[in-house]
Amino acid sequence: MSDEKLVPKLRFNGFDEEWNEVQISDIANVVGGGTPKTEIENYWNGDIKWFTPSEIGKTKYIHDSERHITEEGLNNSSAKLLPKNTLLLSSRATVGEISIALSECTTNQGFQSLITKNNVDNEFIYYLISTIKNEFLRRSSGSTFLEISKNEINKIKINIPTLSEQKRISELLSAIDNKIELLDSKHENYQNFKKYLMRQIFAQKLRFDFKMFKLKELSKINKGKQLNKDDMLENGKYYVLNGGKEPSGYTNEWNTLENTITISEGGNSCGFVNFNEEKFWSGGHCYYLSNLSKNVDDYYLFSYLKFIEPKIMRLRVGSGLPNIQKGDIENIKIKILPMNEQLKISNLLLSMDKKVNSIAIQKENIKIFKKGLLQQMFV
């Protein structure tokens, strides 16, 4: 029998008591949901929020639902009216996803929600549940989709400290979440402002003298070389860019120079425009631009192509695996300004992109820090 104490690796000063092992049934009432009959109009479009699993887990708190039911629908179904601060826990398909309800609500039958008792901090349990998602999945069953029963959830064992320590932990993690949310907002605001600037510049709301050129008059359009999955590495020096928005793998060889514009040739993301700041391997479903004309700045051209990206994506043909023909790419029309204006625009948009990327890196670092805390502050 182990003498190891039930304590976390990392905890606040002043707390030294051992944590207690309990079942979820000891700290919360588990409540299922239901769906009123959809063919009865009087059951729907009322004032009572009614959540489905697809709406849960994206954010810590959830306020409103996509659909609403009436009191008559509530009374004539197995849906239950849940109080504010209920932990909405998905028990079907996306098992273990969780959000906190900011107001009274109901759910469909894809939930086993937790109404916590007086001896626990609601937000602490929210964070704790996020650390044991694998336990929910392990206890789930089903052939069409996974599902975990109320009985199985009740039996899950968790470790909790005193209420005061629970609150200290949840306060810290909440502060970190607030910082992430603030960075999310800043990231979105900068992106929206950049889009606004691009509309003003490229939609000619700001007046410039310009000439129209076909893309093939400004650069050579090349198609990359296919690299088989067996030839890719998990941690190679150079990324492999194919038809998607993200690298499809890595390799220790490169075939395309840094500061190169690419356009996805095939797949669901065909038409996606990217600016590659380092050497990479251009794959078989990737167009890359080379031999740019002296009349165009590379980042200006990228920014203009990014602005018209929705139009480029509409050039796709084929239904199974859509693609964009090279001839259609070559004939894309580009608005070219005098070089001094191009450089001003490039510098402005590049500074915006650097700010957006800096915020994204900050956010990712905080998420990594939070993940480390979750691993060390819970038992």
Question: What does each of the following model-derived ranges do?
Answer:
Residues 1-23, 155, 159-214, 331-379:
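Amphipathic alpha-helical coiled-coil/heptad-repeat segments
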Residues 144-145, 320:
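Extended, charge-rich, solvent-exposed interface segments
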Residues 13-18, 112-121, 134, 138, ...:
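Proline-centric
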Residues 37-45, 228-234, 317:
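Short coil/turn segments at secondary-structure boundaries
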